[in-house]
């Protein structure tokens, strides 16, 4: 690939599409990769995240909705920081649950009712 045709992925609109002879090249908004088996929607729009970052983003959104916070950094495998229990507990990741505010509780109830997860 000609490096002159490949623009930098550091644009504010991260799903940068660059013209090439065969089509367009996308760039992930999180990890800046250009090759992935599937492009996923993210905070900057449809098809702005690679497969791995899209799955990670979706899991993060779900955990925030339920009030669960997992302390983790996903920038590189070496820099992953997980809040672990002491080594005597086998190194299990700790999930911290915060109390839901009134609006969040109402939103969660509506979500569960719409998914028919709650039986009356």
UniProtKB/Swiss-Prot annotation:
SUPFAM superfamilies: Glucocorticoid receptor-like (DNA-binding domain) (SSF57716). One of its GO terms (molecular function) is zinc ion binding. GO terms for biological process: lateral root development; regulation of DNA-templated transcription; response to light stimulus. A zinc finger (GATA-type) spans 22-76. Keywords: DNA-binding, Metal-binding, Nucleus, Transcription, Transcription regulation, Zinc, Zinc-finger. GO terms for cellular component: nucleus. It holds the Pfam family GATA. It comes from the Eukaryota. It is found in: Nucleus. The keyword Acetylation does not apply. Belongs to the type IV zinc-finger family. Class B subfamily. Transcriptional regulator that specifically binds 5'-GATA-3' or 5'-GAT-3' motifs within gene promoters. This is GATA transcription factor 23. It comes from Arabidopsis thaliana. The gene is GATA23.
């Amino acid at each position: 690939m000609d490096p002159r045709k490949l623009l930098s992925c550091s644009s504010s609109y991260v799903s940068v599409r660059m013209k090439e002879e065969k089509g367009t090249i996308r760039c992930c908004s999180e990890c800046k990769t250009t090759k992935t088996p599937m492009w996923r929607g993210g905070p900057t729009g449809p098809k702005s995240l690679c497969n791995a970052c899209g799955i990670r983003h979706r899991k993060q959104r779900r955990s925030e909705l339920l009030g669960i916070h997992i302390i983790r950094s996903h920038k590189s495998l070496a820099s992953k920081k997980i809040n672990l229990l002491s080594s005597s507990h086998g190194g299990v990741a700790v999930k911290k649950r915060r109390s839901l505010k009134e609006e969040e509780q109402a939103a969660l109830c509506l979500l569960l009712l719409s998914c028919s997860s709650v039986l009356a």
